[in-house]
Amino acid sequence: IEFDIYRNNKHIGKHIFSFEKIENKTIVRSLIDFKISKLGVTLYKYNAEGVETYLDGNLVNFTSSTDQNGKKKYVNIKVQDDEYLIDGSSYKGSAPIEFLIGTWWNHSIVKAPAQISAVSGRVIKQKVTFLGKEKLNLDGKSYNTLHFNFSSNDKKLNKDKKLNTDIWYEEETLNWVKASFKKKGNWEYRLTLID
């Protein structure tokens, strides 16, 4: 699955997922790479790599490393005694296994009481609102979608830590096709390839 990343309607990078199935194990690799430039000068660079490992459909391991404009962040998660053990740059501790990694491709996240940041391991309690069905045109293709908003339950969080993201899933397949959020500009992830 490939997404183009846009900031203020300008293409700045890519988010690519690959899926590998080996018997009852599924490995999901994710790569995000973008940069913000002005007049040929790079102002901000972002690169993240993550690997999710599932056994019989259940997450058993997750690792990620992120370079956020020179600031290093990471997450390592494993399952022990029916809970997640998280070692992340923002959170170290445990979390219930009904929480999901915030990588968006897994539609089940709409039912999760919280998501775990794929960048830092921070646990984000979430409220999910179904906003309706919409027809979207992306990269020359038309999709019938289900539109959701994900927001933070914790009203005490400062503004740049709050979750407020719109996600669109294709109605028939439940594949993720678009994301939209505001953070120092208007951001969109738009599906370009699904294989």
Regions found by a protein language model. Give the residues of each.
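Acidic/charged, solvent-exposed loop-and-adjacent secondary-structure segments enriched in E/D, K/R, S/T
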Residues: D82-L100
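Acidic, serine/threonine-rich low-complexity disordered tracts
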Residues: I1-V79, I101-D195
